[in-house]
């Protein structure tokens, strides 16, 4: 890890574990560690970023030298607009090379990056940019999605009418004539014109190690989104070097591919993991199953991906196209696969392990969160694999599983996931909201970080995440996680996805409600509902007989494909579903509301 000035103290907890400071006195920058370190080495001329559009004929490759030159030009252009240290800069961009250029350009000048999901509508953009008081936004006219231009600039324009802090908008022309792009004089700047003539070589800002680098929002169960603050030393010290290198064996020779969005944590992983180690990154615009259902596997094949990341929901969706689709492609370049974002059910885990890992490749399950900037549990090359399990605790974080009083629970018992030690990746409070930070993580069990996940360790020492702890279902005094029942439902082969929630019951305390997405070709009728209900009874016992089985075409999901059980539960109970800005498919909420209104 590179510093301009070495730190004088590794860890300072004099104000309490909640306010731990790392690498005190040290100065550094994410760009120093991810790009500048490779100058003058053989890595500098090697490919860093490989991009493919929805049309596979649209491809672009940038070496580290070429990529860094673009970063410097954009960084200099931003400085020419008066943007500098501590200013917040929004990124409202899809999966393009320029998105990653922007990521590093903002950090290079010491500004604070605010990634925004490229599928956001105006309201979530307004909420985030206003909370962070953004000075500038980097955006694009639009992006291709399933062969159709998706307009982004006009969405941003609508939002900025209610964001007075934004003084500058830098606009990339990607769609060209396919998208009209009105420009506001004095505020909007054409990207290409702005960077033309700028220097391709400029110094990187020397920042305090714990200075804010990234302001990334995550949804709360209630209220506005929570602004998590990553520092220049934090994300690299946790997710990149500790989790993905020491635990998950990322190497300089690897080509990384994890199809997501810069608006989520995986976007920063894609930017920083390969660049820190001198590896390469594959970026793909669009969706994994267009222009054909084998696109995702073809990308792995054509670009010789060695390190593949997936979300369980992605695999559930690709499974529907049949085994023969994935088997058409040569995936022999793969060395390691990893997954994150949500709990696995057994059927898709086994499908992926058989058809992609060929029952021999490491399949490393990782889980953490935006708030911790890294992993709480991880897979490694040295621990056994079991469907949906994690081999080890995150290093050094004091990960434990406890009961309501904070006492550790035994093997086979379900408890609350907590972290007892300060973690270099922890959010540096929540953006300008210390009280909410303490309430959210530290006051349930004083002096212990309560993460909000429901976890278990089995008799062999493997760990499992069983859903959010606010998803916990307690039926007749028995506590269970939703994924246990969801595994039974998807195991019937009749449904591709399921969300299980607990709802109040006068006798049992909670009753089970199952919301399921039938597989293509399976009739969504009363017979299916009865079959699914019986599957739960057979697997869990009669006390878990569902009160209701609802059949829908889709479940509410975030962009990184987490199923939002809290939203399903709130809609079912007639409560406000809270912040929905991270949903990729709000129409799923409307469908569920419609079915419940009948």
Task: Annotate the PLM regions.
Residues 45-47, 170-171, 182-217, 224, ...:
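Conserved pre-ATP/AMP-binding loop-to-beta segment of ANL
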Residues 236-255, 265-306, 321:
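Conserved AMP-binding/adenylation subdomain of ANL enzymes
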